[in-house]
Amino acid sequence: MSKIAIFLANGFEEIEGLTVVDICRRCGLTIDMVSITEEKQVMGSHKIPVTADMTLSQVNFEEYDCLVLPGGGQGTKNLEACEPLMQQIDAFYAVSYTH
């Protein structure tokens, strides 16, 4: 069974983030919501607070088959500015691409 991580940054587009989570869970897929900060609570672009399942520092990237980065003006900028996440995505892609 596939395991998915969706990374949430303050300012993420709620529709793009939560719809993915909803559909995956309805299909029986495992998807973890991950805050890119040390706080589990993330604020969406329309000021809707969302509580993630874990924080970035708690993620073992080797457990995941798919990484999701939802859009949203400020959320996208915050994802891109998160250097630890960008490094992990590069490493994840390098390993995935070779298999």
Per-range role (PLM):
Residues 98-99:
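Conserved small/polar residues in nucleotide/adenosyl-binding loops
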Residues 1-93:
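Extended, subdomain-level signal for the structured scaffold at the beginning of enzyme domains
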